Amino acid sequence: MSRIVLRREGTVEFYAPDPRAYGSIYSAPVFYNPAMEKNRTLSVLFLKAYGATGLTVCEPLSGTGVRGIRYAVETGAVGRLILNDISREAVELIKKNLEVNGVDAEVYNEDANVLLHRLRDKCDVVDIDPFGSPAPFLQAGFRALREEGVICVTATDTAVLVGRYPKKCLRRYGAVMFKTPFYIEAGLRNLTGYVARVAASEDYGFEPLFAYWEGHYFRLCARAVRGARDADSNFNFIGYVEYKKPSRKVVRRPGERSLGPLWVGPMGDPILVNKMAEYGPYGDFLQLLSEEYSVAAPWFFKVPEFALGGVSRGIEEALNALKKGGIYAVRTHMAPDGFKTEVSAGEVERVLRIVI
């Protein structure tokens, strides 16, 4: 493949297809999306903050290999790197990029699931970053993990996960979804709940460490620990959210206006995310996530839901009013006018009416 350009992300240089030569990134023989640089940088910060060293890291859908190479160069955590792509041209480019950066790795040209099954019980970290849904790769991904490990997934089929295509969502993720003011968080929790159920089916306990939404994708990194008792505990955090405008509540059995099944437990580790913020960029974003993770409610509210006298207040005015009323509330990264709190919609409205 001759039509390539030298690019840079973080501290690594690598070759990727020249989008000008192919018309778009989607027409190139090897997929590389520069818009996902933030995803890759946050993933590097995550693995660095995770704190382990000598890890066996597998990226079964490598493309140019830049994610895995950045793990090896920038985290100090990787002892063995395994890169794979089903495309021969991608594998050639991966090898070239490894050479450019002086990184050693095992490189395979196989179907991702075939490789993951062959790596059974051998990986500490499996990072599944597909174009579209991670669902077809999750079972094999868990089987590749050791007794304790980390699984990371990206999902770009956000329209399916939030329920814009409800039948496809039901087929692919086994969840009933419909439009709500907090549909983005519901979509992220839909993905997380699905991954947790797959983890349980492979006898792994599951703990989300870092999860977020960014424009056109959801991202999740979670700890997995093998054991039937741990796997059973996953279902303590699987439930449904009943939405009857504007109220929300967690229920264990679905009703007519219920979303789910969803992950209704914690979405991340604030301590780990604060440590990520110490290592590099996106500090404000990570601080916001850390604050969000401190609120247990599996939803957020939007200020316009509480328009008083037909007038919708700004987010800062609403947060200040809630604080004066003794209610803890934080902003969410999922909506500019959104906030998370553990009190009911009725209590939010009552306080806003009194204070504003």
UniProtKB/Swiss-Prot annotation:
Covalent S-S links between cysteines? none
GO MF annotations, alphabetized: tRNA (guanine(26)-N2)-dimethyltransferase activity; tRNA binding
Q: Which InterPro entries match?
A: SAM-dependent_MTases_sf (IPR029063), Trm1 (IPR002905), TRM1_arc_bac (IPR022923), tRNA_met_Trm1_C (IPR042296)
Q: Does the keyword Membrane apply?
A: no
What's this protein's function?
Dimethylates a single guanine residue at position 26 of a number of tRNAs using S-adenosyl-L-methionine as donor of the methyl groups.
* PANTHER family named among the record's database cross-references: N 2 ,N 2 -DIMETHYLGUANOSINE TRNA METHYLTRANSFERASE (PTHR10631), TRNA (GUANINE(26)-N(2))-DIMETHYLTRANSFERASE (PTHR10631:SF3)
Taxonomically, the superkingdom here is Archaea
Checking Gene3D superfamilies in the record gives: N2,N2-dimethylguanosine tRNA methyltransferase, C-terminal domain, Vaccinia Virus protein VP39
Q: Which reaction does it catalyse?
A: guanosine(26) in tRNA + 2 S-adenosyl-L-methionine = N(2)-dimethylguanosine(26) in tRNA + 2 S-adenosyl-L-homocysteine + 2 H(+)
Put simply, this protein is called tRNA (guanine(26)-N(2))-dimethyltransferase
Listed Pfam families: TRM (PF02005)
Under HAMAP family, the record lists:
tRNA_dimethyltr_TRM1
Q: Which family does it belong to?
A: Belongs to the class I-like SAM-binding methyltransferase superfamily. Trm1 family.
Annotated signal sequence range: none
Give start and end of each Trm1 methyltransferase domain: 5-352
Originating gene:
trm1
